[in-house]
């Protein structure tokens, strides 16, 4: 009988005990031990095996249940190495902040107290050995009677009492260290969160004589904001680093082996199109979450729906500019996007457009196609799965859910422009907030139209702000089959509703006067519809011919 698939299980011991299919990543333990740095931060996208690897480190190093844990590494790579002598040698603290998210700072304070109380409850056995003062401190943390200010020292306190119990330094593992910081950024209380976590992390990780090693995981490296500015003993390994490149994610060889095991090796090229394409250092890797889902359900679709990542995409769309639209368009047309990537994110202010792309890269929504020099890279969409997620997010922002978009696009491609105008007007009135359409926000309308373009991407190529004739047109939908009809659109906004029709006619005249159809005709397209589109708030008028 074939092994089961441990979908959603990120506890290493459970995966092994339940005899689930496991790709041996225990070489990571050997690399961690050989790595001389005291504190290591691994930045990888969500669902790339960070928690499973942390859980593996916990079971490997933990002095508690040493013999029992030794068994779970039987026949794995690490068992046959010199590094295996480190198994079961240290007390371990494993704190996951994955679910530490809150809408307000007050709620976050409560969540922090609960998370630390839960952590301490795993070490209640230490109470037997503590003096009165330490017992009081421990019990107050357990009962959530401690001021938040005092909790900044909680992890260091725990390392001390563990050291005193075992006379061994402590391994500290903090999973998803940045989850509460991203939540604070999205919900507007970042400075308060930063002040707490900066001290919370540095007290345990810096100048701590009870610390053997610290390992943190997250998506981003929040360093400009000063979270780790005090840590001079920190080594950071991001997706741009040349070490630990295959510790997270699956290599092609590992994916082929898994497909073969389940008798579906013929799917490799489809699987590659959908889930491959990530570049970590010099290794090309697949998204492990999606591969596990595919092995389970044997269906090619987007499995990697990640709410916090989608919040970031929505953030990009919220602050959308004409430049963002054009960049997204290039990405959707399969082109690369040149960007300066510093590898750090400053969440203390609204992200600049450049930093948004960086965040998208570290979150797994873009990947590196080519390194130009030290900080400059060409980025692209990694695969079909991510492309599908962008499209879905785009469509929901502009068109809501349901079949509105389908009917709208049918009207356009069948050249029923009056019906197209009516349907677009309805979408503007029902799906779009006033802020999006306020005066002069042409970028929003570009986004709206681009969403339509994405919908047509199988049969059409969409382009915006490209030189043709005597100027630059706003938007063109060009058919791949040159016998079909093309559409040239020019947008103008006005704050005078009575001038709506007049402005739409001006836009139409501009298309003709500036000969925007030249490049289409050169490409062999004969049938072209010219559309001048005028907006005033949520009102629209299209003049066409």
Which role fits each region the language model picked out?
Residues 1-441, 456-463, 482:
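Phosphate-binding site recognition
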């Amino acid at each position: 009988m074939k092994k089961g698939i441990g979908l959603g299980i990120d506890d290493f011991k459970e995966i092994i005990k339940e005899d689930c299919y496991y790709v041996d990543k225990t070489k990571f333990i050997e690399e961690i031990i050989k790595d001389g740095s005291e504190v290591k931060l691994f930045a990888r996208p969500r669902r790339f095996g960070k928690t499973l690897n942390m859980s593996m480190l916990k079971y490997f190093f933990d002095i508690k249940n040493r013999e029992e844990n030794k068994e779970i590494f039987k026949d794995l790579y690490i068992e046959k190495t010199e590094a295996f002598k480190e198994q079961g040698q240290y007390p371990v603290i494993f704190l996951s902040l994955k679910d530490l998210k809150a809408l307000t700072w007050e709620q976050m304070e409560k969540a922090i107290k609960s998370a630390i109380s839960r952590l301490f409850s795993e070490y209640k056995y230490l109470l037997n050995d503590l003096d009165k003062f330490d017992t009081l401190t421990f019990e107050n943390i357990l009962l959530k009677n401690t001021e938040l200010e005092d909790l900044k020292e909680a992890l260091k306190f725990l390392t001390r009492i563990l050291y005193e119990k075992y006379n061994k330094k402590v391994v500290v593992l903090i999973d998803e260290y940045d989850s509460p910081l991203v939540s604070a950024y999205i919900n507007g209380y970042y400075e308060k969160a930063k002040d707490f976590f900066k001290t919370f992390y540095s007290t345990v990780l810096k100048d701590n004589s009870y610390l053997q090693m610290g390992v943190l995981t997250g998506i981003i490296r929040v360093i400009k904001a000063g979270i780790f500015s005090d840590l001079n003993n920190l080594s950071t390994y991001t997706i741009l680093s040349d070490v630990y490149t295959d510790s997270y994610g699956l290599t092609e060889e590992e994916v082929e082996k898994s497909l073969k095991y389940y008798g579906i090796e013929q799917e490799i090229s489809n699987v590659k199109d959908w889930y491959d394409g990530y570049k970590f250092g010099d290794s090309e890797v697949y998204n492990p979450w999606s591969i596990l889902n595919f092995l389970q359900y044997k269906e090619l679709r987007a499995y990697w729906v990640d709410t916090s990542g989608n919040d970031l995409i929505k953030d990009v769309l919220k602050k959308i500019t004409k430049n963002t639209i054009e960049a997204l368009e290039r990405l959707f047309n399969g082109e690369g996007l040149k960007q300066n990537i510093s590898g750090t994110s400053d969440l203390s202010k609204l992200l600049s457009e450049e930093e948004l792309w960086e965040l998208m890269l570290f979150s797994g929504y873009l990947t590196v196609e080519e390194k130009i020099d030290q900080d400059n890279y060409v980025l692209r969409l990694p695969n079909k799965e991510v492309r599908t997620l962008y499209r879905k997010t785009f469509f929901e922002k502009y068109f809501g859910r349901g079949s509105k978009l389908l009917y709208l696009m049918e009207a356009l491609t069948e050249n029923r422009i009056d019906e197209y105008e009516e349907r677009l007007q309805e979408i503007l009135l029902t799906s779009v907030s006033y802020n999006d359409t306020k005066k002069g926000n042409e970028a929003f309308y570009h986004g709206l139209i681009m969403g339509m373009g994405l919908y047509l991407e199988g049969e059409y190529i969409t382009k915006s702000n490209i030189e043709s004739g005597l100027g630059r047109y706003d938007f063109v939908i060009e058919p791949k089959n040159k016998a079909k009809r093309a559409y040239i659109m020019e947008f103008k906004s006005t704050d005078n509703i009575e001038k709506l029709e007049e402005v739409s006619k001006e836009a139409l005249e501009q298309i003709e006067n500036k000969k925007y159809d030249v490049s289409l005709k050169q490409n062999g397209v004969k049938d072209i519809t010219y559309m001048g589109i005028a907006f005033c708030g949520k009102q629209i008028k299209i003049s066409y011919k």
